[in-house]
Amino acid sequence: GNQDGFWQADADSRASLTRKMGDEAERYDKFFGTLNRLADFALNEDGDRFQPRQSLDYAPGGRNAELLDDARRLGLIQWNNDTDIVFASREAAAYFRGGWLEEYVWYKLRGIRPHDWAVNLKTQSYAAQVENECDAAVVHRNRLLVIECKTSGFGKNEMRDVGYIYKLAQLADQIGGTMSQKLLLSARPIHDNIRQRAKEYRVDILAAHEVRRFVEYIKCWMQG
């Protein structure tokens, strides 16, 4: 629809930033968490007022400052090299809250052209009458891959982390049966104990420096 057209134009305009964040994810590690948190405060889901002005604990330098500089040039934020960041819109805040990783997936899938794919999907389970959200799904030769994108940190709360994995496994099985494949794409590192649990649920993981292997992973799966 038209809405999709607008979204794609926006995603295209910031594709270089999106690509940089995904391909070099391990360089930004904790800064992703910081941006995620500030964007969350700005969007303020409990209240309905958007609060675009947010404060960092310290003025970023080096590669983090470079990232903010790129974002400023793209009109996503206002930033004067200090601790204050002003998100230009709700959409810009949503991008930094994690939307960028979904755009990364969209951007890469568009280049690979599997048979069918969608990002930011709502699925209805007829049995349970429950609507579920799915970050991305790819269908190729009658096989389904369900992708979950995460930009917040893993490792602080194991129960919550395993919960993400369980939910992804459940969702994929509901949509595509037990033969569906599942991928957790994380901008932040994931520890071995969580990877072990993911294996038990047959969930693949690409995290931090592995994110740049996303295209290779998809091509391999398509040939499967």
What are these regions (language model features)?
Residues 1-224:
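Intrinsically disordered, low-complexity Ser/Thr/Pro/Gly-rich regulatory segments
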